């Protein structure tokens, strides 16, 4: 090659380098001169970040300023994500996985509680989605059959609300989204997306599976299944994080707890993740000692919610937790209050209702970070502003006494012995072995302020402050989920427990009669029992000892709880001889006065306890009974008559089937109840199969039509607080307060005021009340005379008579005559097959056949739902494609393997093989529920200040409900404690046997 060519090439290379150099210089000048401001601002934005400084939540204090819920700076274990994952450069070794396992093991070794939100649980070698468990728990807690899908569950709730009178029959025909609004307005919030007919937990599960691309993993690993089980998902997520195959699934789950927490929270590198709070000094020392082995793990100090009194007033205070996914947009898009995804918010009670006041304003710290997100310098700091302080109407001391007294009374009812009180001990015989829960509420009769409210058993809201563990949450669930009365720590019986009030209702019947002309001196000669045909309606003294109350006026009737007197004045007719009461009264007037006393309404506490914090009973009515019967009849026919017509079936002709069922149900409205012969004729015209005629006619006539109308039995039950009467203790104490204060119905409330952290704003709650429109409110004084005699001469004498203060009271018991479900109904049924005269092999054969038929129905229904959603204009294209994919892959619905579902189908199989057996026959080996024990009072009787209501499910006798009142009144009135307490050898129950009130549910008797 000649020299000239070489020189030419060198020149070319030089020129290239020169051009590049010039271009670089020009670019530098351009960036530093022309675009300096732009790039300087961009650099600042990339290197300066704001790190949130959490604001303390506002405190909650009692009426005197004593702390009920506060905050304390706790040491927490946090993970800085950039340090945690920065060395994960190979597929063979993951520093993040190693660190995750080490920190969880360290926390466990030190008995520290840590946040565990990984949605797959492994128990006894089986894998479960917590999403599925939450759906099961929701159904159990709300007495919903486990085999119902989302749509069926929603309409099951709707039918129940119609039956309770909270929705109308016409509401059922509304568009699903509009109906959902009505259901919500009634205080019920089913976790169901009606637009897609799926549970919110199902949607969350699908989102979670999508996040980890589990379907893609299935294809890559040639897994030919559309049913993604918890075990399959676990393996997929394990592979996603490249967890060492030598580790067990239990160890892998510890890693996944940390990895999933980080991923699900969506934290940026400079925002740490809290994995454990309130850790011990020993744990702090170990984390610092092993710092080199735990990259990214550090100790921090931040405000954490604390409840210093643990379980005290837990149901009023409520608890906090992470923002529910279903409510995420509501919080994160809030323009007035700024929330971040990891904020803790009030989920129940005052914590929920006062969320906007209690939530503080976070501060921030402006920091400088390097290229990989590490903090290199701390700059500006804006301090956080704590939330408002909320003051309650509660008196902490009275609350403590109320809770303690209630718990001791329940124990005394169950075990007997001595109820120990500073104001005088009381000997009791016990025997109410299933008395395990109860409620007590104390209110100011003049304002409606709640001074104390106790529900037993309770719970410690501290469990929720950093996220409750799965095991802790399960421990708070009823031990027997089949039993509606099983103790449930999270349930506030004061405002959410609806029960028959028994004889505590009798003052309403008395007031209705007085307002319509009754002379309180009007007397009957009580024989102890009324016979109407073969049916008896007796006093408690008659049922126990064939005794009676003799000559009885209103005062004595209240004192001794004479049922027959209230039958008489509640119907305006004397059925035991002598003159009728001079009162134009019947069930309509009793219902009217029950409503005047607020028993058809919420008490007002729902405003302070958050959505869902208060339920309410309904005053019974003839219309409600007919509607309820129609709903039950339709439910029955929908289940048993789906293939009972010769020309149609429920599945193939749903519209015509519904029309015929509606027509049958409307027979309940007829003035003259159709006879069996008439019903048989009508069913034939509706083309019911000959084989089904007799069975359907018997059920329609004798189970439904004959009990649709209002009867004398219903009128009697209404008058004495039995039958369809059912109210919360809060509703009852509100009505008793109205008697005490001369006829003013107060809204109950528990939030007194709030004060901002800088004391610049004070928001005081104004009491709400209305004067009841009585004809003569002086009639209330006649009721009070009788209530005072309960304490001076009646059932309350031995418990409250020695307090040295005038007290007005009334006791009551109400019977729940049904059987107590076992904690394993399937095993119960299997263990008694021989008594049911059925063969085990045959029963199981029918059992599996019935399950298969139901699964086929569910699958068909699901396919139809999917097709409807695809055809709907409201469904977006992305969702339509997903639904089409589901149809292509094949839809297969399976019944869950739960005790409730298994037992339901086993029971059906038994009845199919033995047509003569009834549910009563099947359940005859079970215990019967004990009576509800009630007591109400107010004191001082002549100038009332407080009213009290105590209720103990299965307490058997009302004496036990009186016991807590001794301590409550003593504490409130500041009475001197007894210097020496003595107990009678004979228990109060034995002395007062002849004074106990009626506990018979006549409608139940008649049905039997």
Positions of predicted regions on the chain:
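Short, hydrophobic alpha-helical segments
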Residues: 33, 410, 740-743, 972-976
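Conserved catalytic/cofactor-binding microenvironments
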Residues: 762-769, 778, 979, 983-994
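Amphipathic oligomerization regions
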Residues: 943, 953-972
